[in-house]
Every structure is written in C-alpha cells, then in structure tokens.
C-alpha cells in the first residue's frame, strides 16, 4: 500500500497548573528549600514524549541547582490526559503539570488547538518546528489561559507524524474521500 508523507502532526504542549501551589505550603517551603512538582505523562518513559519529560526534568533541576525537582509520573499512573486536566481544573494540588495533546485541549474549548491536529496542516517536521518557533505559536500556547483555564502552555512537543497506509496512493486531502480511517 501507499503512504503519505504529508501527514498530520500529533502535537502537544506541556501545561503547567497556575492553580497548583508553586512552592507548596508556605510552612513546608520555609523548612525545605526544595520544591517538588509532579509532572503527569500518559505515555511510558521510553517513548519520545516520555523522553521529553525526562529531559525537561533534568534541565529544570540543572538550571535551578536542584532547588526545583520534577517528579515525572509516567505510563498514565495518574490517569488519561483528560483525567489529569480535569484534576487540575478541579483544583487538585497533587498534579502540577502535564503534557496535554493539542487534540485533548479541544474538549475544553481550545478551538485554535484543533488546527494543530488537522491532517496536512504541516508538510513535514521542519514546517511544524518553523511554526512552533514562530511569533504565532504563543497564541496557541496561551489559549487555555485566555479562556480562563488555570493552565499555561509552556512548550511544544512533537509526537511524530501520522502516516496513512492505503491500497490506493494518497497525495492530498482529496484522496481520502471514501476511505475509512482507523486510529
């Protein structure tokens, strides 16, 4: 079968809860100068997004001299993306940040995020990263806060591109007419 190189990017953002206590309880912070933040990830650590979480943890701890510790909870042990976001929205202080896919954010009214999940939005990885590093990208990262959600997008991640395998060649969106898709 054929496959399309102009596939849809599966994008995600790391979302940090602005409602969660940044330094935890004030008394605890005074007694322990370290701040531990819980990072929820639905995928295992050996995936690209799991590796991104690990890299984020290492960089934060390095750049803060260890005063901020990131506790990565992977493999969905804290729930699905929607479970995690619901917990954050409900005021949970047990989760401080999570990687949330652009598609998952659409369930919470983030309509700009839908654009990031449409097939053929990006021609290739370079095209996606040109967008992610552009002046337009913050509009998407800031959308949850603009809608009043207590989360902040802090970076883009790329989970890879979707590839479509078919009996007939696919070179553009029109070629999908009549095809059944399974994801």
Where are these predicted regions, by residue range?
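Residues at or immediately flanking beta-strands
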Residues: 36, 67-71, 180
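Extracytoplasmic "Venus flytrap"
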Residues: 38-54, 75-79
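Short helix-initiation/N-cap motifs at beta->coil->alpha
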Residues: 73-86, 170-171, 183
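Short, polar/charged alpha-helical segment
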Residues: 24, 46-71, 135
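Short, low-complexity disordered leader/linker segments with a strong preference
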Residues: 1-36
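Conserved N-terminal glycine/acidic-rich loop preference
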Residues: 30-32, 49-52, 79-87, 94-97
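Contiguous mixed-secondary-structure segments that line small-molecule binding/active-site clefts
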Residues: 58-61, 91-94, 101-183
